[in-house]
Amino acid sequence: MTDKKRRQRGSRTHGGGTHKNRRGAGNRGGRGRAGRKKHEQHNYEDVGKSGFKRPEKTDRDVAVLSVQELDEDIPVLSESGVAEETEFGYRVDARDVVDDGWDADVVKVLGGGQLYEQLEVTADAFSDAAVELIEGEGGDAVVSERASEDDEE
């Protein structure tokens, strides 16, 4: 065992120079983290937790869709089979309309703009303005079963 600790046995100062050299905090550059901005000691990491971590159950991926977007896209959605034409208007599932709608935790329909078609829209959530617009045109805002199951948990 020829490590430094073993080699220093019998030495009064263990390589620290004279017996006066290791006295006090001044020889060590201060106590604790003193002098960390002035001395050439880099990469001090701030230790400990900081900031706010949001609870995971409240951190949801929400995809949004406005009523006006739905209204403008109805002809295209009807042609592609996403919107189903019924006797009163159109039936649409918002998850099929939104990009990555099936990957999102929640698909919410927001009010905004104008609505000229009667729509039966199925989504996880609706803003009050969206419900007002949809039902104002004689349509129906249906909260999906998937959203109801999530609320029960």
Swiss-Prot record:
Q: Which of UniProt's keywords are assigned here?
A: Ribonucleoprotein, Ribosomal protein, RNA-binding, rRNA-binding
GO MF assignments: rRNA binding; structural constituent of ribosome
User: Pfam families under this entry?
Assistant: Ribosomal_L27A
Basic and acidic residues: which segments have biased composition?
41-60
Task: Name the SUPFAM superfamilies on file.
Answer: Ribosomal proteins L15p and L18e
Q: Where is the composition biased (Basic residues)?
A: 1-40
* Keyword match RNA-binding: yes
Please give the biological process terms from Gene Ontology that the record holds: translation
Per the record's keyword annotation, is Ribosomal protein included, yes or no? yes
Enumerate the residue ranges of region (Disordered): 1-60
Q: Which cellular component appears as one GO term in the record?
A: cytosolic large ribosomal subunit
Q: Highest taxon of the source?
A: Archaea
What the protein does comes down to: Binds to the 23S rRNA.
Q: Which family does it belong to?
A: Belongs to the universal ribosomal protein uL15 family.
Q: Which HAMAP family does this chain map to?
A: Ribosomal_uL15 (MF_01341)
Oligomeric state and interaction partners are given as: Part of the 50S ribosomal subunit.
Protein's recorded name: Large ribosomal subunit protein uL15
- Give the encoding gene's name: rpl15
